[in-house]
Amino acid sequence: MSDYADKYHCINFSRADGVLEMTMHSRGGPAKWGTSLQSLHAELGHAFLDVARDYENKIVILTGTGDSFISEMDAEEPFPEPSLAHMWPRIQDEGLALLNNLLAIPVPMIGAVNGPALIHAELAVLCDIVLAAEQAEFADLAHVPGGAVPGDGVHTVWPMMLGPNRGRYFLLTGERIGADEAKRLGFVAEVLGRDALLPRARELGAQLARLPALTLRHTRSVLVRELRRRMFDELSNGLGHEGLAMLCPSPGQA
């Protein structure tokens, strides 16, 4: 872990007995989503690759900071390129790395959703075990509600989690799903008080970490096989649609 522990601006790492914790943040506070070269969008894909390559990791816990998982955009992190057209190739590459590298982590992942996950909640629900604080809620506010095509993987993830029709409704309307409803729908395993969330994640992590390393790795492989196949088939296409809609103004808006 020493080669990446202090490498990232938006992610803190700690590890005990093979259980790695990745804590997302923005300047030490709750994580916000931005598009700068030092944003979570830029860093997470690289971080997931570093984590995947570290054989000392037996379990990975992904969580946020304070009372929010990721609930808002970061206005202090604008993209550095002179225009959206100049930025989009980087954003597309980062988008591909973000979910593909998360799913390429070869050990089980636990998502500990410490508060609202309103932007890129798929990062949490793609984990093998999803725990949520009572105050957590899930939505996709970064795309259709904000005028963007939901093509960066959420178009694959949410219809898989919720079923085709409910998933499309969720993406089109910006529906917010609370923690208890998320558990009822099946994409959250346990709902806990915020103070009990990380201790429970660590308890589960320690329990799993006692299993043989190869058992964990091959179990993870079979559990995410279909997700990886779907991402391979659909992510590039979806990002292409998202970028096209951003770069080509609608009639009357040119």
What does each model-found stretch correspond to?
Residues L98, L102, A117-L171, R200, ...:
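CoA-thioester-processing core
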Residues P89, A112-N114:
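Structural motif
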Residues M22, L44, L62, P108, ...:
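Terminal peptide-recognition signature
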Residues E43, A47, E94-P106:
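Catalytic-core regions built around general acid/base machinery
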Residues M1-H25, T173-R210, T215-R229, A254:
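Amphipathic alpha-helical segments at domain termini/boundaries
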Residues G28, S36, E56, T63-A97:
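Glycine- (often His-adjacent) and acidic-residue-rich active-site loop
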Residues M109, P116, V130-L131, V191:
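Short, well-ordered beta-strand core segments
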